[in-house]
UniProtKB/Swiss-Prot annotation:
GO molecular function, one term: DNA binding
Name recorded for this polypeptide: Sugar fermentation stimulation protein homolog
Organism: Synechocystis sp. (strain ATCC 27184 / PCC 6803 / Kazusa)
UniProt cross-references to NCBIfam families, sorted A to Z: sfsA
Family membership: Belongs to the SfsA family.
Taxonomic superkingdom: Bacteria
């Protein structure tokens, strides 16, 4: 299979427990129990199942306090990405490979983590530019919550996420604004805002669409070998 982002060799285990937001105890296949860094500090609603199979990466950096990082978990037969640093790595490669038809001809270069907003204290995940074209501001959101085949974001109240939506609205119409939802599991075919988890986010989401913010709910298949782009999910508003 041709992966957009191939993983290095990963280590299999079973989730024993997750605690203090940043930590997870995992029993490796050889019976050893190790403590891994959990990059996802959110509630991980529906994707933190004790006893589920997980995969870890291991760093050789002696300066790291924890050598292992929790990368993914298997929920009801589907691998779900846990590492919140993954989406931006994958989208960076996707932009380099120009795999998004609605963006392909609209940029020559792109830069990550560019300051923007009224106070320049926010950072857009990617800024795409091309002479004589509007700049494109792309915000990326890791999405793991699902109800059957419907992916939902957010999975908890997020004032930060609300702020990002408002900032995208504010840059219109002098630039293009894109909210890209990285659906970090391959079993979801549709996407909707998680109104039950953050009603205000849902309201702003619909306001953003009405104002001209472009929504890209991107489907990705994740497994221990790598990450593959599956196309766009259908937006349910």
């Amino acid at each position: 299979m041709d992966f957009l982002y191939p993983y290095p060799p990963l280590i299999s285990g079973i989730l024993v427990k997750r605690y203090k937001r940043f930590l997870a105890d995992v029993e490796l296949d050889n019976g050893e129990i190790v403590t891994a860094h959990c990059p996802n500090t959110g509630p991980m609603t529906g994707v933190c199942q004790v006893g589920a199979q997980v995969y870890l990466s291991k760093s050789d950096n002696p300066q790291r306090k924890l050598a292992y990082t929790w990368e993914m978990i298997q929920i009801d037969g589907t691998w779900v990405g846990v590492n919140t640093a993954l989406p931006n790595r994958v989208i960076k490669q996707a932009l380099a490979d120009r795999i998004f038809p609605n963006l392909t001809n609209s940029y020559d270069t792109f830069k990550p983590e560019v300051p923007y907003g009224k106070d320049k204290k926010s950072r857009i995940d990617f800024l795409l530019t091309k002479p004589e074209e509007k700049s494109i501001y792309v915000e990326v959101k890791n999405t793991t919550l699902s109800q059957e085949k419907l992916a939902l974001f957010p999975d908890t109240e997020t004032t930060r996420g609300q702020k990002h939506l408002q900032e995208l609205i504010d840059i219109l119409p002098t630039a293009r604004a894109v909210m890209l939802y990285f659906i970090n599991r391959g079993d979801c075919t549709h996407f909707s805002p998680g109104d039950a988890y953050d009603r205000r986010y849902g309201e702003l989401f619909r306001q953003a669409i009405a104002a001209g913010v472009e929504v890209m709910p991107c489907r990705f298949m994740v497994n221990p070998e790598g990450v593959k782009f599956l196309g766009m999910a259908e937006l349910v508003v």
